[in-house]
């Protein structure tokens, strides 16, 4: 059987895209996924342009693959993702042995591209933005365990001064709500218990309904939570300026929505936030967190931070450290600023030394790690509901799973627990994981069973006095 290897860099959206590519090419060309690139007949590199020197990293990887192409002339090499979208034809200028260059919105065309290359075409570059067509042509979802990612939208309209996403993935496009619910219902039928809704800015979701109306993100969350079998709902990533009160209300009345939120602030200094074009202040961000904790007192927050943004002063950084303490972040993805070509911030003078940037990053991460450990220690002796994912990586005789607040828990259990929930008493706390003992299995929990996605959709379809259909969410 012909084999496919995909190297994936970057965000969860890229991981989702790579899984869809693998499923698609398996169904159309019978390509079997392999983790050994030297065995592959098709090599795909799914790239990320967020970090510094992303382009050079791509060409370095392609250089290693070039030699395999000499030994195997029929080997097809493709480059996708955000660097492909940014660089386009330039990739083939520097690496003419690359057969296919495709963007995040054209991965669904890979079967046709491969057929054309096998039919004698020299090379194909397709980095267009065909909007929702991508989702219409992907294969049915396939569960790989009790958790799954589901893309609900793509792109971003915010144009933060440091970010390439609007240029590489396009502007915001939301999937129709029925399509999202149907995909999640299919996954639930395959045993998925937790879904993570994906998008560059999920709270901007505005999906079309069956009657031509619009479903907001808050409404979508309630609909997803009502699907039979789905007992946990997560989402990533969101933007503070669209974190509206209706979303906060979902935290009040929807227990399936986890008490853990990733809401990036990037900086705690208003001056820096203005230069970043974030369109909110630190006070406005903290107001969102305050309202969230009024309805979910135990919610834990993670964030992204950019350290050393052009013009960031020592006082600006102290403001960031102050916000970290005030919000009491649990986790963070924090990076030293690196200019992305084509973004407005790339034209700003980089006036901070590398030594200072590294010192600030180390101090920030140390503070976040300290706070995270405090949260973990507070869990000692408590009972935590854990979704069992499979054997532990540290000891195959044990099981591992995750808590609602994303902590890894290792424990002794039986194989029939995999894919189900167990209540664990936490007995030990480590830097990157917890350990505990089973006190309750899922059969003893009495988890609710509501209804299928189809019945949710049918129940929310209403008509007005004129007999015109309208979409009502009343769960």
Curated annotation (Swiss-Prot):
Q: Which terms in the GO cellular component ontology are assigned?
A: cytosol
* Cofactor section: [4Fe-4S] cluster
For this protein, the record's InterPro entries field holds: Elp3/MiaA/NifB-like_rSAM, Methylthiotransferase, Methylthiotransferase_CS, Methylthiotransferase_N, Methylthiotransferase_N_sf, MiaB_methiolase, rSAM, rSAM_horseshoe
Highest taxon above the source species: Bacteria
SUPFAM superfamilies, alphabetized: Radical SAM enzymes
Q: Which keywords accompany this UniProt record?
A: 4Fe-4S, Cytoplasm, Iron, Iron-sulfur, Metal-binding, S-adenosyl-L-methionine, Transferase, tRNA processing
Q: Which reaction does it catalyse?
A: N(6)-dimethylallyladenosine(37) in tRNA + (sulfur carrier)-SH + AH2 + 2 S-adenosyl-L-methionine = 2-methylsulfanyl-N(6)-dimethylallyladenosine(37) in tRNA + (sulfur carrier)-H + 5'-deoxyadenosine + L-methionine + A + S-adenosyl-L-homocysteine + 2 H(+)
NCBIfam families in the cross-refs = miaB-methiolase (TIGR01574), MiaB/RimO family radical SAM methylthiotransferase (TIGR00089)
What is this protein identified as? tRNA-2-methylthio-N(6)-dimethylallyladenosine synthase
């Amino acid at each position: 059987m012909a084999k496919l290897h995909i190297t994936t860099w970057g965000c969860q959206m890229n991981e989702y895209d790579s899984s869809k590519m693998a499923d698609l090419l398996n169904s159309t060309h019978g390509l079997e996924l392999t983790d050994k690139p030297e065995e592959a007949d098709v090599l795909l590199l799914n790239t990320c342009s967020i970090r510094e020197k992303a382009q050079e990293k791509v060409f370095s990887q392609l250089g290693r693959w070039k030699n395999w192409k000499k030994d195997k002339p029929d080997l097809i090499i493709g480059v996708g993702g955000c660097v492909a979208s940014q660089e386009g034809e330039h990739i083939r200028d520097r690496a003419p042995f690359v057969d296919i260059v495709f963007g995040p919105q054209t991965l669904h065309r890979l079967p046709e591209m491969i057929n054309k290359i096998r039919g004698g075409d020299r090379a194909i570059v397709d980095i267009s933005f065909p909007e929702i067509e991508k989702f219409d042509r992907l294969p049915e979802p396939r569960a790989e365990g009790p958790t799954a990612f589901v893309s609900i939208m793509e792109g971003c309209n915010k144009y933060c001064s440091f970010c390439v996403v609007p240029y590489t993935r396009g502007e915001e496009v939301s999937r129709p709500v029925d399509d999202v619910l149907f995909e999640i219902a299919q996954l639930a039928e395959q045993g998925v218990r937790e879904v993570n809704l994906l998008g560059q800015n999920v709270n901007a979701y505005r999906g079309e309904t069956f009657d031509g109306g619009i479903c907001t993100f808050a409404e979508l969350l309630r609909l997803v939570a009502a699907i039979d079998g789905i007992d946990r709902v997560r989402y990533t990533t969101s933007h503070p300026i669209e974190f509206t009160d209706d979303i906060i209300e979902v935290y009040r009345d929807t227990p399936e929505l986890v008490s853990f939120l990733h809401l990036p602030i990037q900086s705690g200094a208003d001056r820096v936030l203005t230069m970043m074009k974030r369109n909110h202040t630190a006070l406005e961000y903290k107001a969102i967190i305050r309202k969230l904790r009024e309805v979910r007192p135990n919610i834990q927050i993670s964030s992204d931070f950019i350290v050393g943004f052009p013009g960031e002063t020592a006082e600006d950084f102290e403001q960031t450290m102050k916000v970290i303490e005030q919000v009491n972040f649990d986790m963070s993805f924090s990076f030293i600023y690196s200019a992305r070509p084509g973004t407005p911030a790339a034209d700003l003078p980089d006036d901070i030394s590398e030594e200072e940037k590294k010192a600030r990053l180390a101090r920030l991460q140390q503070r976040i790690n300290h706070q995270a450990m405090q949260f973990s220690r507070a869990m000692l002796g408590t009972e935590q509901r854990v979704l069992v994912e499979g054997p532990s990586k540290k000891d195959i005789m044990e099981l591992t799973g995750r808590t609602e607040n994303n902590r890894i828990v290792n424990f002794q259990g039986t194989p029939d627990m995999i894919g189900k929930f167990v209540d664990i008493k936490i007995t030990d706390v480590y830097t990157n994981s917890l350990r505990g003992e089973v006190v309750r299995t899922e059969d003893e929990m009495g988890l609710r069973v509501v209804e299928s996605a189809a019945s949710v959709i049918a129940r929310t379809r209403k008509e007005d006095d004129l007999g015109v259909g309208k979409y009502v969410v009343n769960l």
